[in-house]
Amino acid sequence: MSDWRHLTEAGVRRARELLRGRPTLSVVVPVYNVAEYVEKSLRSVLDQPRREISGLEVIVVDDGSTDGSAQILRRMAAEEACVTVITQPNSGVSTARHTGIDAATGDLLTFVDPDDTLPVDAWSAMVRSLRRTGSDFAVGAAERVAVEGGVERRFMTPLMRRNHAAERLRCRIEDAPLMLADIFVWNKVFRRSFWTENAIVFPERTRYQDQVALTQVFLAADSFDVMTEVVYDWQVRADRSSATQKRAQLANLVERIDTKRQTIDLVRAGGSAHLMQTLLVEVLPIDMWEHFRAAVHPDTEDPLRYWELLRGAVLEFWYDAGVPFEDTTVPAVQRLMAWLVAQDRAEDLAALIAMIDRYGARKAVVRHPWREDPALPPDLRDIHRDIHKVGRGALLTWQPMRG
């Protein structure tokens, strides 16, 4: 028998994989008050084909649920030998994931959120690729799934589609910098040794725990594999209490700003100037428009403080860094929003958003009223081409609301 005493953990893992040909996979599922969805989610995990793995362990961490989730988990664990349930006082999703990671014993590691589902055969391509390339992790595409009027609708964000248009093996983040935008943990399969050796952690008590951890992951990886297959179904629910539906909360904005700041610090310390440029120009601006809208929404919590924090972040992350927001790659209407924030023009921002809401960004063409402002960057003087291409005569001239 081979003597493994002098091998590292990673070496032992690779030796075992060579001997049996197929690795084992640990799936970590943090659960808190999702009784309506968790059984369907876990069924989609348990129904996965296992031809590429020699063993499956599903570690479900009940984070102090009070809605009946715990009873469902205990029943499923009694029915399925590969399911282990760990119960802990409510501590947040990051702590629950860490508990699951600590209990994992598989060669490979992946994650599932308890109100989402997996498509048929979610893991095979990623596991097969890792066996072939030796990369630290593999990442597949994710689709958002919404049910409207009883009809299921699937869609993929443009950047997700762009990132997964072609298979790319043994990538480094410097070679595929836009992958920094893939800030989700659940569409990836990791070598567990890679995760533990690099001490990857999810920040505690934040709505945006994945972005910092995944930035660490991309920077630490010697290589990763990008797959074209859809490996995760991200369920969009009308009643879902997700971070993306709570932008108007002050705490939400504070956590988003802190997450972006931590991400910038990580890339500045561990990446190239090119990677930093990509982060500022193409990645970090993507979701800012939601906060621009929230800043002038009537239900926004403490609107004066919200505006102050938002404007400070826009100035700090872009203008003070020498990358004006108008030089980013988001649509021009969003760049105009950012410019109005930077100029401290809340009333004008509210007027712009009211116009877009009234006519619809896909139906109306906006010629905004500040195009003669000498301070306005030239490419923001006419933004209608970025909003929608329409026929002649559809141009709308609009004057801002007067208070």
Task: Please tell me what each predicted stretch does.
Residues 1-19, 236-403:
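C-terminal subregions of glycosyltransferases and related glycan-biosynthesis enzymes
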Residues 1-256, 262, 384, 389-391, ...:
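Nucleotide-sugar donor-binding/catalytic module of glycosyltransferases
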